[in-house]
A protein has these predicted regions:
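Bacterial Sec-dependent signal peptides at the C-terminal "C-region" and cleavage site
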Residues: 21-32
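A structural signal for small-residue-enriched, beta-sheet-centric alpha/beta enzyme cores
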Residues: 32-106, 110, 121-354
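N-terminal secretory signal peptides and thylakoid transit peptides that target proteins
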Residues: 2-18
Length: 354
């Protein structure tokens, strides 16, 4: 008999330790809390998209105008980020005011400048005496291979995303940072599929953990419940899905790929009170949600990055293991929603279209 604890056992123990009952789902009868909703279900969080109409690209802002404690964990080998060193628990700044996710590769990091302008106009930022400096970390994904690469999100795009932000359910699929996202690229873009951005939330009594993810992975996306591929690499004729890893094991050769031409980026947020050390741990655990749904993941071609935010709006303390475990579940659900909400474009079909 296997005596090692399962993921469900760990979640059950964490909930018992934290003293919370599950609002949607019953741990006692073996069910994991149900997911749905969005990251905006977390108090203190707003989301806004800017989607460029000239080619599939854009940016997505996660606003925390009252400030949120933040952490980060980077697992891919080709990340593109801004203002992430300050999230190290050893460093001074304790709160951020927004996280920017953007297409456009490194050019897209300029969207954070637009978010800073938006926040400064509203008197929001880290008080340095002579000014308030908005703290806006950012991460980007590579979508320059979809359409005209000279068109990419800039500071104005970031500003417009902030102006569009609200606490309502955000759009999913081919919008914002997910507008140019694709998956299943191990055998080249000619066999890839369209992806997008997705969101989800898990609610327990008195606390919420939410996620939003722009899925631009080199690997395939799987539904962990069934083990089936939802979106990914296609056969050479483009008419059906293949399992990339199984194809490789059967001897199919990979074409030359350039590092950094993929990347999945996302944010998890909760309304519980967390420290910088704890948010960093939550971001680390949240990557398990990518590992459950994407294969291969965290590759040399990806810059997979997850931020974690704690708004503290519930005023509740919570077991960090519980929050991290729920964050991984929320990330996994957001990944699935990202590919299922996507719609195909020329040469890139979406899930359900083949």
């Amino acid at each position: 008999m296997n005596s090692n604890p399962t993921r469900r056992d760990i979640l059950r123990g964490a909930i018992a330790t934290a003293g919370f009952s599950v609002a949607a789902g019953n741990v006692a009868d073996g069910t994991i809390p149900s997911t749905g909703g969005s990251i905006t279900d977390v108090r203190g969080i707003k989301v806004g998209h800017f989607t460029d109409t000239r080619r599939p690209t854009g940016c997505t802002v996660i606003l925390a105008e009252d400030g949120a404690v933040a952490g980060i964990d980077v697992r891919g080998s080709a990340p593109g980020t801004r203002e992430t060193d300050l999230l190290n628990p050893l460093n001074t700044v304790q709160q951020v005011h927004a996280i920017m996710l953007s297409g456009g590769s490194a050019f897209g990091l300029d969207t954070a400048t637009g978010a800073m302008r938006y926040l400064e106009e509203r008197g929001i930022g880290f008080n340095v005496g002579v000014a308030k400096v908005p703290i806006v970390p950012a991460a980007i994904l590579f979508d320059l291979g979809v359409g005209d690469s000279r068109i990419r999100p800039d500071a104005e795009a970031g500003y417009r995303a902030c102006k569009a932000a609200s606490a309502s359910m955000p759009a999913e699929g081919n919008v914002g940072a997910g507008a140019g996202a694709t998956v299943g690229k191990l055998f080249g873009m000619s066999r890839a599929m369209k992806s997008g951005i997705g969101t989800s939330a898990i609610k327990l009594e008195g606390i919420t953990v939410g996620a939003t993810v722009a899925v631009n992975a080199v690997g395939d996306v799987f539904d962990p419940a069934s083990g089936k591929i939802v979106a990914g690499a296609r056969t050479k004729d483009g008419k059906s899905l293949v399992n990339s890893m199984e194809s490789i094991k059967r001897g199919e050769q990979l074409p030359p790929l350039m590092a950094g031409t993929a990347t999945t980026i996302g944010v998890v947020a909760t309304d519980v009170v967390l420290s910088k050390v704890q948010t960093t741990k939550v971001a680390q655990m949240a990557h398990d949600g990518l590992a459950r749904t994407i294969n291969p993941v965290h590759t040399a071609y990806d810059g997979d990055t997850i931020f974690a935010l704690g708004t503290g709006k519930s005023s509740k303390q919570a077991n960090v293991t519980l929050v991290g475990a729920l964050a991984a579940e929320a990330i996994a659900q957001a990944v699935l929603r990202a590919v299922r909400a996507a719609r195909g474009i020329a040469g890139l079909p979406a899930a359900g279209e083949i």
